[in-house]
UniProtKB/Swiss-Prot annotation:
Keyword check for Phosphoprotein: yes
Keyword list, A-Z: Lipoprotein, Palmitate, Phosphoprotein, Signal transduction inhibitor
Function comment: Inhibits signal transduction by increasing the GTPase activity of G protein alpha subunits thereby driving them into their inactive GDP-bound form. Activity on G(z)-alpha is inhibited by phosphorylation of the G-protein. Activity on G(z)-alpha and G(i)-alpha-1 is inhibited by palmitoylation of the G-protein.
PTM characteristics: Palmitoylated on Cys-2 and/or Cys-12.
Annotated organism of origin: Bos taurus (Bovine)
SMART domains assigned to the protein according to its UniProt record, in alphabetical order: RGS
Name the record gives this protein: Regulator of G-protein signaling 4
Gene giving rise to this polypeptide: RGS4
Pfam families listed in its UniProt record: RGS
Length: 205
């Protein structure tokens, strides 16, 4: 396996350094790390310790593959942030967290928080929804349920899939990940190549 950047060929090292510069976001505290509530907030360690070339390539197969992977979600979120359009993925993440709520008493306050942040007229991070979906979601706020954001989340997912996801696949964020993850194969022929994310993302504290 590819252990860090030191063992890579010179050409790969240049690519790695360039990628490390472009993906400096991974060295900082990432909201996507906080998405996994099973880890202590005091000492969060990045889940994506290793990303194989095969996994990175799968991100190009579908948006679902991309955002269901910890590193993929982090890269996509950073790409959207660089375009000042991260509200869509933030809304999607909030909806995913909302659907995991077990206590009925916590649904209403969380639903209102999401609504005020992403959907209301005065939302600080308003997402682009059609009037019908926005009105439907507003009505759902009268008696919030676990599915009250499902339609809005589906619309935003489709929007990202048709727009920002396609741009992401052509961006340096993604292309650098593909190039670096393939470098391992130059050193070990026949072995499953992988990128050691720990060399780029030591921790998310």
């Amino acid at each position: 396996m590819c252990k860090g950047l030191a063992g890579l060929p010179a050409s790969c090292l240049r690519s790695a350094k360039d990628m490390k510069h472009r993906l400096g976001f991974l060295l900082q505290k990432s909201d996507s790390c906080e998405h996994n509530s099973s880890h202590s907030k005091k000492d969060k360690v990045v889940i994506c310790q290793r990303v194989s070339h095969e996994e990175v390539k799968k991100w190009a197969e579908s948006l679902e593959n991309l955002i269901s992977h910890e590193c993929g979600l982090a890269a996509f979120k950073a790409f959207l942030k660089s375009e000042y359009s991260e509200e869509n993925i933030d809304f999607w993440i909030s909806c995913e967290e909302y659907k995991k709520i077990k206590s009925p008493s916590k649904l209403s306050p969380k639903a209102k928080k999401i609504y005020n942040e992403f959907i209301s007229v005065q939302a600080t991070k308003e997402v682009n929804l059609d009037s019908c979906t926005r009105e439907e979601t507003s009505r759902n706020m009268l008696e919030p349920t676990i599915t009250c954001f499902d339609e809005a989340q589906r619309k935003i997912f489709n929007l990202m899939e048709k727009d920002s996801y396609r741009r992401f696949l052509k961006s340096r964020f993604y292309l650098d990940l593909v190039n670096l993850s393939s470098c391992g194969s130059e050193k070990q022929k026949g072995a499953k190549s992988s990128t050691d994310c720990a060399s780029l993302v030591p921790q998310c504290a």
